[in-house]
């Protein structure tokens, strides 16, 4: 494809050779491309840093959530510790990925930004100084040769036109000989025309050859000047290429966690924690604490004593150890004792029978004293288990299906979370957010630094508070993300 040189030399370019007029522009464009490539590399690293940060946050949230679930779940002993080791691994790996993010942005990103600023200098009229210098250098080196090339093209065009005219004159003269109507005078004019065309052909040929010779004589100097400017552009590009290689190697070191001593230690510790799990030890512990190894106050003969105001029958003692936990006690007066969740958990051998006995019989009721009654409050919705229903059944096979997963997000984070402790209401306090927080679960609040909300409950043992936004949304948020409004 032919293009026209924009320096008004009127030369048509028939190839993409560097030596053709105007084809140096690809070399000039490479300078502008270098600046754009610096920006592209910075954007590339910035996106990777965002990914590293998001992954670190997800690991932290995952570890927090599952640490809470495992702590309150039915798993026990050394296997529980091995399971919990994965949460510690996630937290430590999260820290490493945050370090990767910091290295990418603070070291690599800033290094590219500073180099770009030092290597490329913007002009008031737009563009870069380096681009204009290269453009002017090539234009100056090519201008004399392009001028001679223009003369050659003009001489060639004139010579070819003369040759064409000569051929036409000869053709007319040959045709006129066969025409008897032409007089000798007309025939002589045609012959004179042929002679004149031959002279024009000779003159244009000499001029064409002369201009071409002059062009050939100026070509070595043209090539030398163009080569000099091109080498300057090559040196500039070499600096950029070497810099990119250096930066990419540093990025590789920052991303390669296998070379971090702490990374190997994380998985060494994880493996040791898993290998420390001992099924025999866990079974022995469960036998001693929840099985036949437990101590028992076997029934013995007791002498009757008039000083005893209250006695418990064997049946009552059995019920007391069957795991019935009272959540409310109504006394004879208007006074009532607050409910207190049990700190221990006893699994009844027959839950249905125990529940029936609990509702129909009070083990602390004095058989002789009709003035005092002890009963459960029917309207109390407090749970008698502090964390997890130990008697619930689990599916035989583990499944990713949320409907069969006892630790699914619906159960673990929704309103029916079996691990949630009873909420205890407190005095509402207005607080202000210190940092931005984006809720990771549907029961968590999202807010920006400076937003105000209402704290409804004090911080729990996991570091979370219950609060309400001004739009009425109620949920959980990290306690250390806010401060009380003075």
Swiss-Prot record:
Species in which this protein is naturally found: Homo sapiens
Residues annotated as domain F-BAR: 11-282
Region ((Microbial infection) Interaction with HCV NS5A): 1-362
The keyword Membrane appears for this protein: yes
CDD domains linked to this entry: F-BAR_PACSIN2, SH3_PACSIN1-2
Region (Disordered): 314-426
Regions crossing the membrane: none
Motif (NPF1): 362-364
Domain notes: The F-BAR domain forms a coiled coil and mediates membrane-binding and membrane tubulation. Autoinhibition of these functions is mediated by an interaction between the SH3 and F-BAR domains. The F-Bar domain also mediates the binding to the cell actin cytoskeleton through the interaction with CAV-1. (Microbial infection) The SH3 domain is required for the cell-to-cell spreading of HIV-1 virions.
One Pfam family in the UniProt entry: SH3_9
Free-text description of this protein's post-translational modifications in UniProt: Phosphorylated by casein kinase 2 (CK2). Phosphorylation by PKC probably decreases the membrane binding and tubulation capacities of PACSIN2, thereby modulating the lifetime of caveolae.
Subcellular location as annotated: Cytoplasm; Cytoplasm, Cytoskeleton; Cytoplasmic vesicle membrane; Cell projection, Ruffle membrane
Modified residues (Phosphoserine): 273, 313, 399, 446
Bias (Polar residues): 327-347, 383-396, 404-416
Protein name per UniProt: Protein kinase C and casein kinase substrate in neurons protein 2
Span of the annotated motif NPF3: 417-419
Coiled coil: 25-274
Its membrane topology: Peripheral membrane protein
Residue ranges occupied by any SH3 domain in the UniProt entry: 426-486
Motif residue range(s): NPF2: 405-407
Modified residues (N6-acetyllysine): 53
The UniProt record lists the keyword Acetylation: yes
GO BP terms, alphabetized: actin cytoskeleton organization; caveola assembly; caveolin-mediated endocytosis; cell migration involved in sprouting angiogenesis; cell projection morphogenesis; cytoskeleton organization; modulation of chemical synaptic transmission; negative regulation of endocytosis
Bias kind Low complexity: ranges: 348-363
Subunit field text: Homodimer. May form heterooligomers with other PACSINs. Interacts (via NPF motifs) with EHD1 (via EH domain). Interacts (via NPF motifs) with EHD2 (via EH domain); this interaction probably stabilizes the caveolae. Interacts with EHD3. Interacts (via the SH3 domain) with MICALL1. Interacts with RAC1. Interacts (via SH3 domain) with DNM1, SYN1, SYNJ1 and WASL. Interacts (via F-BAR domain) with CAV1. Interacts with TRPV4. Forms a complex with EHD4 and MICALL1; the complex controls CDH5 trafficking and coordinates angiogenesis. (Microbial infection) Interacts with ubiquitinated HIV-1 gag (via p6-gag domain); this interaction allows PACSIN2 recruitment to viral assembly sites and its subsequent incorporation into virions.
GO molecular function: cadherin binding; cytoskeletal protein binding; identical protein binding; phosphatidic acid binding; phospholipid binding; protein-macromolecule adaptor activity
């Amino acid at each position: 494809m032919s293009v026209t040189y924009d320096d008004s030399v009127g030369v048509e370019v028939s190839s993409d050779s560097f030596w053709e007029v105007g084809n140096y522009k690809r070399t000039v464009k490479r300078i502008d491309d270098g600046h754009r490539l610096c920006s592209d590399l910075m954007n590339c690293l910035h996106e990777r840093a965002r990914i590293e940060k998001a992954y670190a946050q997800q690991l932290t949230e995952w570890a927090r959530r599952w640490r809470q679930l495992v702590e309150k779940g039915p798993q026990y002993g050394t296997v529980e510790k091995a399971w919990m080791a994965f949460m510690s691994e996630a937290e430590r790996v999260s820290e490493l990925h945050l370090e990767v993010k910091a290295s990418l942005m603070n070291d690599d990103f800033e290094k590219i930004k500073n180099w770009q600023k030092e290597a490329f200098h913007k002009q008031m009229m737009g563009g870069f100084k380096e681009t204009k210098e290269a453009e002017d250098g090539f234009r100056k080196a090519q201008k004399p040769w392009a001028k001679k090339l223009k003369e050659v093209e003009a001489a060639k065009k004139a010579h070819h036109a003369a040759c064409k005219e000569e051929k036409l004159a000869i053709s007319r003269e040959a045709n006129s000989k066969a025409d008897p109507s032409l007089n000798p005078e007309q025939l002589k004019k045609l012959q004179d025309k042929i002679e004149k065309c031959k002279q024009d052909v000779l003159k244009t040929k000499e001029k064409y050859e002369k201009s071409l010779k002059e062009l050939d004589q100026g070509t070595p100097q043209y090539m030398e000047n163009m080569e000099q400017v091109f080498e300057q552009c090559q040196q500039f590009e070499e600096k950029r290429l070497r810099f990119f290689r250096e930066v990419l190697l540093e990025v590789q070191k920052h991303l390669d966690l296998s070379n971090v001593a702490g990374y190997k230690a994380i998985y060494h510790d994880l493996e040791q924690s898993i290998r420390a799990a001992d099924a025999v030890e866990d079974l022995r512990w469960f036998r001693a604490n929840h099985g036949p190894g437990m101590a028992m106050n076997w029934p013995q003969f007791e002498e009757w004593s008039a000083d005893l105001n209250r006695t418990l029958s064997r049946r009552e003692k059995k019920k007391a150890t069957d795991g019935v936990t009272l959540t409310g006690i109504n006394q004879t007066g208007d006074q009532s004792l607050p409910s207190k969740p049990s700190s221990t958990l006893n699994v009844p051998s027959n839950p249905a029978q125990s529940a029936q006995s609990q509702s129909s019989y009070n083990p602390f009721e004095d058989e002789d004293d009709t003035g005092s009654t002890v009963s459960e409050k029917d309207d109390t919705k407090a749970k008698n288990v502090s964390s997890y229903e130990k008697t619930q059944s689990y599916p035989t096979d583990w499944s990713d299906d949320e409907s069969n997963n006892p630790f699914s997000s619906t159960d673990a984070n929704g309103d029916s979370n079996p691990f949630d402790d009873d909420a205890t209401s407190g005095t509402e306090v207005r607080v202000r957010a210190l940092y931005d927080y984006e809720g990771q679960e549907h029961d968590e609040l999202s807010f920006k630094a400076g937003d105000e909300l209402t704290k409804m409950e004090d911080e729990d043992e996991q570091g979370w508070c219950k609060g309400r936004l001004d739009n009425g949304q109620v949920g959980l948020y990290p306690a250390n993300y806010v401060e009380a409004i003075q």
